[in-house]
Amino acid sequence: MVNYPHKLSSQKRQTSLSQPKNFANRGMSFEKMINATNDYYLSQGLAVIHKKPTPIQIVRVDYPQRSRAKIVEAYFRQASTTDYSGVYNGYYIDFEAKETKQKRAIPMKNFHPHQIQHMEQVLAQQGICFVLLHFSSQQETYLLPALDLIRFYHQDKGQKSMPLGYIREYGYEIKAGAFPQIPYLNVIKEHLLGGKTR
């Protein structure tokens, strides 16, 4: 398609540039990368890991016909546990994914008490639990074991954010790839299931 200069297309460009920013899908690119990675793992028979649906509170339903209900008003509830769960090589896996534009830390307000409690319960049952942290400004991704997140959460309750230095010390950097895009199973296999120690 050739774009010839004329008023209509320049007007369209101006209106699209002046639209207010919508932050509703912030982090979606990271989420899409994780979903693509999970699809790859599933297609290769390596793991079965899925994103948990966000609970919705239905407020109002219209019934235009007896057989057709139409949800008119609904709201997202706060997620009750973590983002992803599944099975890898006989092990239960449960993890949260967080993305930030900050360069030196991840805000602790992103982690809710019920999520920390859920991670503690998963670890008590010998499950593999962690958080994937993505620093979008540096394009760096880390796997931080839940135990290290929980320790930081309980010891440093006054902290507003977890420093990148702590994440680098206790976490594992994941280099992005083509297939899979975020090869976190490599870290699990090598570091969390009896491979190399820190």
Curated annotation (Swiss-Prot):
Reactions accelerated catalytically = Endonucleolytic cleavage at a junction such as a reciprocal single-stranded crossover between two homologous DNA duplexes (Holliday junction)
The residue range of the signal peptide is none
GO CC, any one term:
cytoplasm
- List residue numbers at the site (Transition state stabilizer): 98
Cofactor binding note of this UniProt entry: Binds 1 Mg(2+) ion per subunit.
According to its UniProt record, which cofactors does this protein need?
Mg(2+)
Query: What are its E.C. numbers?
Result: 3.1.21.10
Instruction: Please give one Pfam family short name.
Output: RecU
| Residues engaged in binding Mg(2+) | 81, 83, 96, 115
Comp. bias regions, Polar residues: 11-22
Please list where the region (Disordered) is annotated: 1-22
RNA-binding among the record's keywords? no
Q: Does the keyword Transcription apply?
A: no
* Gene3D superfamilies tied to this protein: 3.40.1350.10
The protein's UniProt keywords, in alphabetical order, are:
Cytoplasm, DNA damage, DNA recombination, DNA repair, Endonuclease, Hydrolase, Magnesium, Metal-binding, Nuclease
List the GO molecular function terms: endonuclease activity; magnesium ion binding; nucleic acid binding
Recorded family membership? Belongs to the RecU family.
List, alphabetically, the NCBIfam families matched. PRK02234.1-1, PRK02234.1-5, recU
Q: Which HAMAP family match?
A: RecU
Can you say what this protein is called?
Answer: Holliday junction resolvase RecU
Whose protein is this, by species?
A: Streptococcus pneumoniae (strain Hungary19A-6)
The record lists the lineage as: Bacteria, Bacillati, Bacillota, Bacilli, Lactobacillales
What is this protein's gene name? recU
